[in-house]
Amino acid sequence: MKFTLQHKDPSSQARAGELQTDHGVVKTPIFMPVGTAATVKGIFHRDVRDEARAQIILANTYHLYLRPGMDILERAGGVHRFSTWDGPMLTDSGELQVFSLAGCRKLKEEGCHFQSHIDGSRHLFTPESVIDTERTIGADIMMAFDECPPGDSPRDYAAKSLALTERWLDRCFNRYRQTSPKYGHYQALFPIVQGCTYPDLRARAAENVKQYDADGYAIGGLAVGEPTDVMYEMIEVVNAILPEDRPRYLMGVGTPINILEGIARGVDMFDCVMPTRNGRNGQIFTSEGTINIRNKKWEDDFSPIDPEGTAFVDHVYTKAYLHHLTICQEMLGAQIASLHNIAFYLRLVTEARRHIGAGDFTPWKEQMVAKLGRRL
């Protein structure tokens, strides 16, 4: 895996680059649609690739571990063959789901004991078992196993949690170096920088992960309830320390404005469920602001969903029709909204990349942030 830094914005920390994987090139900055169970909910892979123009998608280790399970995935030849997605893929380590969805029943030095949210069965995730699981899934980029504490954690707990994450990280890399890919393509392992909202803990974590000389680095534990300005401050603290020649991934973030502000602070990769989850509930993102398509004002608006959009749904369907589908809870409404939103996110980062290359990212970003904050 190779990351090439191609352009730097003269008036911010924004960067444009290329990440070479065995499944293709990813041009950064990039947004990664979330395909939790090896599918971006409600959208054909063909449309994710060709209409939304996604270059890389994300899948979730916790969910794939429980269903379909590692035996099925290994017999299928890994997640790429199983799902037929032939582009780059990233798996998170499942730590967020273990600590939230499943409910971590017992957190120990060895790992986390938890119960399946599906059938209540008991399981144990350790740094070693998570690396083994991610090897079996076979994504191009794997994430280290860590603890993601609440954003408002007291300092003593945040420090204790970070120390555990650092010990787990060492075990993750030991296991990673002891094992090999199962399906013939290279797999990178990204460490995750934690530290809650404490600048000194974030700085310590960023310094610590540098020792692993990883292919890339992730920033976790943000957008979990802390004020937005604090999130931006933590990004600045971390990115001032992380190596400049490696990609930086901000996990689980966020709104279109968050993404532009993250790019301005030197982030290269993003993922978030917002475009699909919020789309299913009637929130439509556009370059002129946000639409709640459930509102009555759209019931007789026969204009296209987004005249500037790049996906076919933006021009074929009207706001009135999407309003009707959403109110009636028709599956097609969720599909249209999800595809539009993902395509919008991808168009946004593509435009950001173009402006970074042109040297005028900052004034463009400021204009976009002003528009994106509007409620239409």
Where are these regions (language model features)?
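A non-catalytic, amphipathic alpha-helix used as a structural packing/dimerization or gating element
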Residues: S129, T133, K160-R171, R204, ...
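Glycine- and acidic
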Residues: G151-R155, A159, G216-L222, M331-A334
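C-terminal extensions of enzymes
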Residues: M1-E18, V26-M32, K41-G42, D146-D152, ...
